[in-house]
Each structure stands twice: as C-alpha cells, then as structure tokens.
Amino acid sequence: MKRKGYILEQIADPDNLRHAYWNAQTGKSAKKDVIAFREHLDSNLVMIRSRLLDGSYRFGNYHYFTIYDPKERVICAADFGERVVHHAIMNICAVDFENRQIPFSFACRKGKGTLAALKQAARYQKIYPWYLKLDVRKFFDSIDHAVLFSQLQRMYKDARFLNLLWRLIDSYHSIDGKGLPIGNLTSQYFANHYLSYSDKYLTEQLHQKAIVRYMDDVFLWAYDRDELIEKGQRFENYVQENLLLTLKPFVLNKSEHGLPALGFHLFPEETRLNASSRKRFAQKMKQYDIMLKNDAIKDTRCAQNILSMYGFIACAKHKGFARTIVKGFDAEGSNRVNRVIIYCLTI
C-alpha cells in the first residue's frame, strides 16, 4: 500500500476535532474533567488545533489506576483533552489500520470483536483435532517504540504527523524505549497493528489456514500435532527477532479437551463460561441488585448494562447458571432487575 500524506491537517480540522470531542465524551459527560472541558469547548478546541499545527502539542498527562478484572492490570489514562486528540487521530487513521488487518484478526475492528472471535474458534474446534494457543508475555509493556514507529513510517509520509505520533509513543515507557499505555484508544490500534506483521508471517510464510487472533492471544488449529509444534517454534522465533516480543509457554492440546479462550472454554460440541467469568458475572449482577435497591442506577441504564453482559455470554451454555444467580437476589431489588433478566433469558 502507498504511504499517505497530508494527514495532520485532516486531524486538526475543526469539524474533526469537534467530532472527536463528542466521541470522547460519550458515556462520560457527567465527569468533572469532561464538564470542565465543555465549559470552554470552543477555546479548548482552538487551542488543540493550534498546537497540533505548530508542533507544540505534547502528550503524557497520565493518571494510573489498577483493575482486577479478570487479572491485575495497571491502566494508564490520559486527561480528557488528550483523549480528544486520540479520537481525532483515529477518526482519520482507523481506516488505514483496518485495511492492513486480515480476516482472522478480531480486536479493535468494526464487525469483529470477542463474540465473532469465539464463534470462529468454535468452528475450528469442531473441524480440527489439535489446537495451539500462543500468548505474548506482558504484551503492551513489551511493544518496542522504534519497531512500532518504523511500522508507522511505512504507512505515512507526513513528517509533521509522524512527529506527532512519535511524541505520543514516547510519552509513556514501561521500561526505556518500550511500552504503550493500555488505557489509550490509540494504543489499542497501535498494538493490534504491531502484531499484524506476525499475522502475515503465519499466512504467507507458514501457510497456516486455521487462525484466530484477538490482540495478543493467537490460536492455531491443525490435523497434525507435530505441524503445530513446528509452526509454534517458528512463530516464536519470528516475534523474538522482528518484534522483540517474548511468548509465554505454548498450550498444545486436543480440541476434545477444550480450549480456554477469552473467558470461555470451547469444546467441539459446546461453549462454556470459565470459572472466573462465572464469578465476575455473579458479582456484577449482585452489584446491580444492590444499586437498584439503593436507587443508585436507573432501571433503563441497568437494563442496558445487563443486556450487554448477556450479549457477552450469549454464545455459551449459561441459562441455568443465570437463573441460579437470580435466585440469590433479595426481593426488593430483584423484582426490578428480574424483569430485565427474564427478558434476557428468553432471547
């Protein structure tokens, strides 16, 4: 593909910045930093535009917090103004990243996502007797800045835009010269693109057919066990030498024994929630029960959240489990939340 130029002017376009603001504030309009930005919206957008165009815009005003869902992760979140810029960049550039993905990559893509990845993996589980699971150790913290930037240079020739991208990449370090902040919108696209080179290695050099990749979780299937072992070793060598990444130990098994993937356990004949997903689901349902009883959440918002949760587990054998969770609710909150849950159980 040809490298693209004249990108920075498109990103700094007033209409694009305003669109980016609306995208960034979606679902967060009541937060203090969003309200403060909105009170001086026009002047803030003019300032961002000016600094983007004159090259003085700087990233790095981060704050950190830890989540434990399902495992411990340190999230690095930019302030709201920077998030507007992230959205402004991706409004223009998302299509360029999308065009460099191949069909079996499912993260950060419209029309793809977790459920699509699971459905494709479930199909392969029925066809192939063996699977190999590959996972990058500390993926976001291990992404090499120089390697990533060289990849972006192959996409764009706008020097001012590339300087902006370098300042964004260089604003965060897990160790010197490495790491992307998990909380940034741009990080999700950059990280997914980083591994697109290994996707092409799998398909073009190893001629692997049955693949599912969701960010740094890579799953391969084959009829022959030794074929998977050889391809896994060659893939590991490639990412070590070319992407400077380290893989966790391989998980090689028969499909009939089940594939642990993305919060589920996939068998040839059925898909089940794994133990940690069941635990998180039960905890969240109890939280909504308490919030409803205390009028801490509106029924409509609760319904939206619960429907989203049910959408996540829709591909699994789950209805008996969900009914068991419902029985544990106290009466007052349950009467309200049950109406939502009963509806979910019928879809």
Feature map (PLM): residue ranges:
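Conserved two-metal-ion catalytic palm core of "right-hand" nucleic acid polymerases
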Residues: 1-148, 156
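Right-hand nucleic-acid polymerase module
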Residues: 2, 78, 83, 87, ...
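Short glycine- and Lys/Arg-enriched binding-loop motifs that mark or flank ligand-binding interfaces
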Residues: 28, 179, 183, 259
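Gly/Ser/Thr-rich beta-alpha loop segments that engage phosphate groups in nucleotides
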Residues: 34, 181, 185, 265
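Conserved polymerase palm-domain catalytic core
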Residues: 44, 51, 103-104, 109, ...
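A general structural signal for alpha-helical elements within enzymatic catalytic domains
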Residues: 53, 94, 153, 200-203, ...
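Short helix-capping/linker segments at secondary-structure and domain boundaries
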Residues: 93-100, 202, 317-320
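A common structural junction motif
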Residues: 236-244
